[in-house]
A protein has these predicted regions:
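Short glycine/proline- and charge-enriched loop/turn segments
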Residues: 27-34, 77-85
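A short alpha/beta connector and helix-capping loop motif
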Residues: 8, 26-53, 58-65
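Flexible, glycine-rich phosphate/dinucleotide-binding loops
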Residues: 21, 69, 170
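Early exported N-terminus immediately downstream of N-terminal targeting peptides
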Residues: 59-60, 64-83
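N-terminal nucleotide-binding beta1-loop-alpha1 segment
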Residues: 13-17
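Active-site-adjacent betaalpha module
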Residues: 1-11, 47-56, 79-200
Length: 200
């Protein structure tokens, strides 16, 4: 294990590990996040973290991306262009279900967000506060999008951020590498799944 100390009560936050984004085939398969999650062992690593947190009675929290029927889209950018063309991630559909490998158990909370910030209007902040959480272990997809946004949102709220680099990914491996190596270390601890479990 590396030399660091876990501060306060931790929670595991799993971002956007849902059917439409991660399963193959799926409506958003072309983004590559699901392929990367399977090929790089990210799903298995998150499974290990889930088992470790549950086994110690620690919170496991999920965030799911959903697209409101009446949403608006910004004018510029590939994400918005693609979103305008797809009817995907509607509440109550297969798209927004957590992948079966990481399915929540009764009592575990799911928060629904749109588009990127898992805190904006979701109640996640209030829930973490109610549990006395001080440290968040951040996992999921995609490193350069919602996981990255979640990291900054956690930092802005002064949570102690831990990112297991092998428990998140991005369809663009260069983006993942850059964020993990050059951005996250400024606002949190970047380590491995095994190391996190060893410190629980």
């Amino acid at each position: 294990m590396s030399d660091w100390t876990l501060v306060g009560k931790p929670a595991l936050l799993i971002v956007h590990m849902q059917n439409a984004i991660v399963k193959t085939p799926s409506p958003l398969e072309m983004m590559g996040h699901g392929r990367a999650a399977h090929e790089e062992g990210v799903i298995a690593n998150i499974q290990d973290l889930v088992a470790a947190f549950r086994g110690r009675g620690l919170p496991v929290v999920y965030c799911v991306a959903h697209t409101p029927v009446d949403t608006k889209f910004a004018a510029y950018g590939g994400f918005w262009e693609g979103s305008r063309q797809l009817e995907v991630n509607r509440l109550g559909t297969w798209d927004v279900e957590i992948i079966e490998e990481l399915a929540p158990v009764p009592g575990e909370k799911i928060f629904y967000n749109w588009p990127f910030n898992v805190f904006e209007g979701t109640g996640l902040q209030e829930y973490l506060q109610s549990l006395g959480v001080e440290t968040v272990v951040l996992t999921g997809v995609a490193t350069g999008m919602s996981v990255g946004t979640a990291a900054w949102a956690l930092a802005e709220r002064f949570y102690n951020l831990i990112v297991p680099s092998d428990a998140s990914t991005d369809g663009n491996s260069e983006v993942h590498k850059t964020v993990i190596e050059s951005i996250f270390p400024a606002i949190g601890l970047v380590t491995t799944t095994e190391d996190v479990i060893g410190h629980l």
